Amino acid sequence: MEEDEVKIRIVSATAADAAALADLFIGHITAHPEYISHGEIQMGVGEGFVQDGRLVTRPAPGAREKWMKSILYEMSDDAVSHIWKAVDDKGTLMGFCAAYIVGDADIRFGMVGDILVNSQCRGGGVGNTLLQTAIDWFHSKGIQDIFLESGKDNHNAHRYFEKRGFVHVSEIYKLMEK
């Protein structure tokens, strides 16, 4: 290993990590509102409004508290959801990934709810390692169909996911009352 190469360690996130994960997440969607997808809008973490005929997104008031409540709930049932964090050899948070199993006894699929890498750690394999960890977890649970969502203008993420075998499946629309 080269002297400046950072070792990536993937570990399960716990309730004790929720505040740090929330800080990373809220900091990112504040700086990059294009990350906000319909999932964040549905859970009240993000909001959208129409400006000049286009949907504009931003973090919603109380976003951090709403996101922490959601992530703590998801951490409570490892049978259907799991959150991992990537840390370096000093324990510094590099990123995280949240994965969920959706469906019933007959039809189940995997959903990568969030995957986010600290901007200083991008390009070093953190995202790939987190994503592969989630895919392996889904496969260990017998899940083959895996989906994710991404904000409509998050083009860098779209290219990233396409390079890793994901394909564009559909569009989501929200009624914006006049």
Report the location of each language-model feature:
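Conserved acetyl-CoA-binding loop-helix of GNAT-fold acetyltransferases
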Residues: 114-117, 123-136, 159, 163
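Conserved GNAT acetyl-CoA-binding A-motif
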Residues: 138-149
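Acetyl-CoA-dependent GNAT
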Residues: 15, 23-107, 113, 176-177
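Residue-level recognition of the GNAT/N-acetyltransferase active site
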Residues: 118, 151
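Conserved active-site alpha-helix within GNAT-family acetyltransferase domains
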Residues: 128, 152-170, 175
